[in-house]
Amino acid sequence: MMAVTVSGNTGQSTAERLQCEFFLVKKKRQCGMTRRAGSQFCSEHSTDSDRVPCPLDPSHTVCLSKMRVHMRKCNKFRHDVSYQAKQREIPWFKEGLNSISNGKSDSKPADETLVKSVSLIQKIFQNEFGDEPPLPLIEKQNELLERTERYKTLVNRKHARQQSSLIQHLKESKLWPSLESCAVNKTLEYIELGCGRAEFSRYVNIATNLDQKEHSHEKPEYKAVAPSFTLIDRASQRLRFDNKFSSDIGTEVQIRREKIDIKDLRLDAVLHDASQYVAISKHLCGVATDLSLRCLLNSDKCKANLRGILIAMCCRHVCQSSEYVNQEYIKGLLKRQTDGSMAYSEFFQCLKKFCSYCTCGLRPDMDPNSGSEDHITKLTHNERQRIGHMARRIIDEGRAQFLQSKGFETVLFKYTDSAVTLEDTALLALRKHD
C-alpha cells in the first residue's frame, strides 16, 4: 500500500483530534484513526520497527510487546477453531488426523476442460450404470413422531418431513435402541457430525423415546434407556437444541458437544463409553462427508462397535479432490476410458462444477430447454442438470464402495422428494455380520 502524507502541523492543539496522516490510495481518503501527539501516523500505519504482521491475520499489524494479549482477543482467533484447540491443548484435537490433503485447494476448471468432460462423464456413467434407473425414492414416515403436537402445529414441514424419513430409515435398519438391548445394558450412542443446532439428533431422541414407550407395555420387565449423543460442529451455534433433549422426554440424556473441525477430531477422546455407536448427519456439506468417513474409521471404538452410518449428503460442489475418500475409484474409471487423457484432479473439478447444476433450480419464467446459447458447454438447463446428476452419482458411488471395502453393506437412495429438497440423496451403511 502506498503511503502519501498530508501536510499538517503535528503540534496542533490537544483539544483537536489528531488524525493519522496516512493516505489510503485505494479509498482515496485520509486514514480516520487517531495518532499520538508528536507522531505522524496512527499505530496501524506507524513505521516503528516493533510492529509486525499478526501471525493469525497478516492484514493488520501488532506491537511485539503486546503480542500475547493480542493473540487472545484477535478476531481471527475467535473464528479459527484449530488454533483455539491447539492453544487449549485439548486431548481430542490432533491437527490433520482425518485429512490426506496436500494443502492445495481445487481451482476452477478451464472452459475447454469442462466442455471435454461432458462426453467423458456420459461415457463413464453409461459404462458403470448402463440403463439403470435413477436412485430409488424411498421416503418413509415415522408415525409416532408425526403424531406429536409439535409436528402437527408446524406450518413449514420441509425439515420435519426429511427428519421423519431419515429417522424411520434408522429404525427399520435396526440402528435403534431396543428394550431388549437396554435389558442387557447394551447402550447406544448417536454421533452427529456437522450437527449445527442438533435439531436432527433432538428428534432422533424424541422418536426413540416414543418407540420405547409404545412397546413397554408388551415387555414391562424391560426398562427404557435413552441413547446418548455426541455432537460435533466447527461453528458456534445460536439457539441450540442441546438443553431440550432431557426436557423433551422427561429423563436425563447424556449429551456432549464439541466445537472442532472434523479434520482434526480424535473421536475416541469425546465418545461416551457405549456398547454400540451409530453415526448420523443431515446435510453434511461437501468435503465434510469425506472427512467424517475417515474420522469414523480412524476411531478404535468405532472400528469395533460402529453399527452403521446414515448420512444425508449435500454440496458436492465444495468437495476437494485431495480429500475425496475414494480417489482410486475415480482414477480407475478414467483409466478404463480409451480416450481418457484427463487427469484425476481435472476430472474431479469438472464433476464438482456439474454437481452445482443439480441444485440451481429455475425461476418460474425460465424455459428448462433454453440457456444453451449462453453457456460454454452449449447445454440447456435440463441437460446440465442431467449431467450434474450423473456427476453426483459418480462421487456418491465412490463413497459407497469405499465403505464396502471396509466391511459395510451400503445403499444409496433418495430419502425425500426433490420438491422438498434438491439435496435428497442419503448413504446408508450397515456393518456386515460375520
UniProtKB/Swiss-Prot annotation:
Q: Which domain of life is it from?
A: Eukaryota
Q: Which residues cross the membrane?
A: none
The record's annotation in PROSITE patterns points to:
ZF_CHHC_U11_48K
Q: What reaction gets catalysed by this protein?
A: cytidine(4) in tRNA(Pro) + S-adenosyl-L-methionine = 2'-O-methylcytidine(4) in tRNA(Pro) + S-adenosyl-L-homocysteine + H(+); cytidine(4) in tRNA(Gly)(GCC) + S-adenosyl-L-methionine = 2'-O-methylcytidine(4) in tRNA(Gly)(GCC) + S-adenosyl-L-homocysteine + H(+); adenosine(4) in tRNA(His) + S-adenosyl-L-methionine = 2'-O-methyladenosine(4) in tRNA(His) + S-adenosyl-L-homocysteine + H(+)
Renumbered zinc finger spans (CHHC U11-48K-type) = 51-78
**GO molecular function list:** tRNA 2'-O-methyltransferase activity; zinc ion binding
Q: What is its main location?
A: cytoplasm
A cellular component term (GO) from this record? Answer: cytoplasm
Q: What class of enzyme is it?
A: transferase
Q: Where in the cell is it found?
A: Cytoplasm; Nucleus, Nucleolus
The record's keywords, sorted A to Z, are:
Cytoplasm, Metal-binding, Methyltransferase, Nucleus, S-adenosyl-L-methionine, Transferase, tRNA processing, Zinc, Zinc-finger
Give the family per the record. Belongs to the methyltransferase TRM13 family.
Q: What does this protein do?
A: tRNA methylase which 2'-O-methylates cytidine(4) in tRNA(Pro) and tRNA(Gly)(GCC), and adenosine(4) in tRNA(His).
Q: What is this protein called?
A: tRNA:m(4)X modification enzyme TRM13
